[in-house]
């Protein structure tokens, strides 16, 4: 819904369904051949069984709607640390937010190879009983349906950068962690970066978005957010930890 052009130029209102306002842990699955590989705290279903279930849910779910194709990069495009994906969706809300939260667009296409993450999302009819958020780490596939909530459908975030990336990191020798990254500069110009892990709803974003009090700013202190939720951490050639 377009808002008043004079008061809020270029702004639109997107209304969230009242039954679709949070991530759904009980409907979030890791589907791999061996149940033990999904981890002790995750929901599991055999891939063949889940694919069969999802095919029925997706059948006709985008009929009459526009399908958008979003090529995106988690990290600087062209960086050796970047990971790439494509999300197909029928939601303009997803398109606009993926453009904010990832590096998306034509510039990503030349970097897509056989390792890119394949994602499919459909709002369908927002039926909670058919709402599934599914990761297939052995296939590099993400599928989510019957939701329009960001945590369930912006697949570059929790689905890719945390769940799928945990498996990629295990195989490639790095870590995907539920952590913020904060940059701090003192009055002498020395810069330090901090990563911090808090449970959900305990202040990761608040700390990551920290603005120094006015008195500290006048004395030359600066803070900036590198990331407020997920950190991909590697050991550099210098033996130190580096995070994006």
Predicted regions and their residues:
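Conserved internal helical-beta-strand scaffold that buttresses enzyme catalytic cores
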Residues: 1-202, 212-234, 239-244
